[in-house]
């Protein structure tokens, strides 16, 4: 069975044999899937340069099992120019998708969010708002439901100036305790509006998404985060 030609990106690739690659793809219509790219490691293979992260592709594959066989891959546009921190951030986004979304689950909305995220990483001077927005959009699609507008204890509307402590599976409860789980009401209101224009809100959002994504990622560290940390240390 051969798929229709559809848009997609390479999330990750690794050797499969002396001449082939195992490639994780994220496609517009079929979601995430893994394919064998036969002969892609051969010296004369045109796929060697095509199957790269951050290159918009047109893809077709065959097979009914979980592991498909790549039949066609060609660039749909030029590779998005991610450099330095933006490049490591792109690897981080790819690793998130590889680890938290189920295989072969169509999600065109997430594909559009991903495309906009990569475009933002390639063009924006400050990439933090782009990353935080994508993380929140991903959490929404994963079904992570949390009320940012009401106190989980009293049901009262969140107060801009008060502090709230996050409790997993319950939400935010008004609290005077200040630790890693504590957020200002103004942060929660900004989260609801997906407004990450303020630096303090971005820092709070980064802290929250690390907490919220942990159940999906488990205890295994993100390789992209380790790679970023190692390279920052080398530059110092």
UniProtKB/Swiss-Prot annotation:
UniProt xrefs under InterPro entries: ARFGAP/RecO, DNA_rep/recomb_RecO_N, NA-bd_OB-fold, RecO, RecO_C
GO cellular component terms given for this protein: bacterial nucleoid
Keyword entries, A-Z: DNA damage, DNA recombination, DNA repair
GO biological process, one term: DNA recombination
Gene3D superfamilies: Nucleic acid-binding proteins (2.40.50.140), Recombination protein O, C-terminal domain (1.20.1440.120)
Pfam assignment, any one: RecO_C
Keyword DNA damage among UniProt keywords: yes
Tagged with keyword DNA damage: yes
Homology family: Belongs to the RecO family.
Protein role: Involved in DNA repair and RecF pathway recombination.
The protein's name in its UniProt record: DNA repair protein RecO
Species per Swiss-Prot/TrEMBL record: Haemophilus influenzae (strain PittGG)
Primary gene name: recO
